[in-house]
Amino acid sequence: MRRTFIKKEGVVITTLARYLLGEKCGNRLKTIDELATECRSSVGLTQAALKTLESSGAIRIERRGRNGSYLVEMDNKALLTHVDINNVVCAMPLPYTRLYEGGLKAQFDGIPFYYAHMRGADIRVECLLNGVYDMAVVSRLAAESYLTQKGLCLALELGPHTYVGEHQLICRKGESANVKRVGLDNRSADQKIMTDVFFGDSDVERVDLSYHESLQRIVKGDVDAVIWNVVAENELTMLGLEATPLTDDPRFLQATEAVVLTRVDDYPMQQLLRAVVDKHALLAHQQRVVSGEQEPSY
């Protein structure tokens, strides 16, 4: 009987810890009856689970009688030990640039962490919202368009040039003023937005193509230009192409910044990111990978 109680209390502790991770110090907590209903347990078992969390030092609650109970202190790392996180799966872009091979995994020491590489921010966000993955890496530019929907939280921002170096308009040498057909991979939210920003209402035809074949399609004459993550200049020269910097709009800079999205109600994952990710160490790791000083973590 006692072992059954312990098992049930453990389930309630996990549910309470997930709830508390979404609260802030100073917040009035739900009543014990409300918490018992959410935990699908008795009032007595819920009270016992709450006291266990208090005894462990994860939280401190101030009880003010009829005015309710208030969360006075909380230790996010301690609460996370009570949350059943078996592994973490992060949806990532395809690693065609070494910036994507940086050290996010290295930050999750002791927690099984896996990447799922997928082309197109739309599909990464869709899988995140459907509960297939725990978090997704996209550009800030794409994130801003997704955050107009409900259900997403911007949990981590890494700053400019952490997603890609920069995007430029790639075209045949000397043809930048004669663009009539521009290539566009409709799976790339960034490319769609930047193409619309750059060309505006100009009479330029959008031609659907895969992102990775963009340069060859320009060389063949299928399209005149494409907005693309800049490659080595000597490669463009060999292909008879040139690159024009994208300026005069802050959205072009937003497209270079990596951010991490979670589901808005996944408080444990948001707190886990805040608790374990050292942004300075992450960016330093990323630069070592880019320079070839360190092997990427997969």
Which role does the model predict for each range below?
Residues R119-D122, L129, D134-Y298:
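C-terminal regulatory/effector modules of DNA-binding transcriptional regulators
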Residues R40-A49:
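Short coil turns linking two alpha-helices in DNA-binding domains
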Residues V83, A106, I111-Y114, L129-S139:
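Intrinsically disordered, low-complexity regulatory regions of nuclear DNA-binding proteins
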Residues L50-K51, V125:
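Short, hydrophobic-biased segments on the C-terminal half of alpha helices
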Residues T97-A116, V197-F198:
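Short alpha-helix C-terminal cap/hinge motif
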Residues N27-C39, L53:
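A short alpha-helical element within helix-turn-helix/winged-helix DNA-binding domains
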Residues K51-E101:
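HTH-adjacent hinge/linker in prokaryotic transcriptional regulators
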Residues M1-T31:
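Extreme N-terminal segment that seeds HTH/winged-HTH DNA-binding domains in transcriptional regulators
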